[in-house]
Design a protein with these regions (language model features):
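Short acidic/His/Gly/Ser-rich catalytic and metal-binding motifs that mark active-site loops
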Residues: 36-39, 83, 122-124, 163-167
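Cleavable N-terminal export/targeting peptides
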Residues: 1-23
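Internal, hydrophobic beta-strand segments that form the core of beta-sheet-rich folds
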Residues: 157-158
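Subset of outer-membrane beta-barrel
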Residues: 146, 150-152, 162-167, 178-181
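Extracellular loop and loop/strand-boundary signature of outer-membrane beta-barrel proteins
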Residues: 43-49, 83-88, 123-130, 171-178
């Protein structure tokens, strides 16, 4: 009976290092490439979402895990494009999304998947018809390669995006319904684990 407290203390102290191996939160920051049709400018007579555009920028995410695998992600991005060929000279897109995440640790790497809901705010420097704030959802995943116990490299994160884009009716006063647009986002960067 006198050895029971010592045995309990020994088992707890052996368990603590194992708990330290599971990180409860991750912060990601890196590069973002987005390909999406940003909208139909006022110089286009179209009933669709306009030409697809490549945008470069940044991505940041914070993920908190409830256990070893299941967590919640908040992701923010900013993507930018400038073109003299289109009716707008620059486009700035900012997304803010939240949703569940699931990670699959495998050796010195972790694959993950997430489903995010949120919004997109788009601004144009010269054409306000492509400026809007809309609902946006995305599903995707990626791979984190551990560089050390607290730092990982994320070489790939791919997200499929879906949003609605307002269409400008240049032929009359009747408003046209918004058009659904599919997009893709690639991100890569560094993950810090806490």
């Amino acid at each position: 009976m006198r050895q029971l407290p010592w045995l309990l203390l020994l088992s707890i102290s052996c368990s603590v290092p194992m708990l330290a191996q599971t990180y409860k939160s991750e912060v990601f920051a890196g590069y973002s490439f987005e390909r999406i049709a940003p909208g139909c400018g006022s110089n286009y007579r179209c009933g669709n979402s306009g030409p697809a555009t490549n945008l470069n920028g940044w991505a940041a995410a914070l993920t908190g895990y409830f256990n070893n695998s299941f967590g919640f992600t908040a992701q923010f991005t900013g993507n930018y494009h400038g073109s003299a060929a289109l009716s707008y000279s620059t486009i700035n897109r900012y997304t803010y999304q939240f949703g569940p995440a699931y990670r699959f640790p495998v050796g010195h790497a972790s694959a993950f998947a997430h489903a995010l809901l949120g919004g997109v705010t788009q601004k144009s420097s010269s054409d306000q018809t492509v400026a809007y704030t809309r609902f946006l959802w995305s599903v995707g995943g990626g791979l984190d390669l551990n560089a050390s116990s607290r730092i990982a490299i994320r070489p790939v994160q791919l997200d499929y995006e879906r949003q609605s884009v307002p269409v400008v009716n240049t032929g009359g006063a009747t408003p046209l319904p918004a058009v659904g647009v599919n997009g893709m986002r690639y991100s890569a960067g560094v993950v810090l684990k806490f």
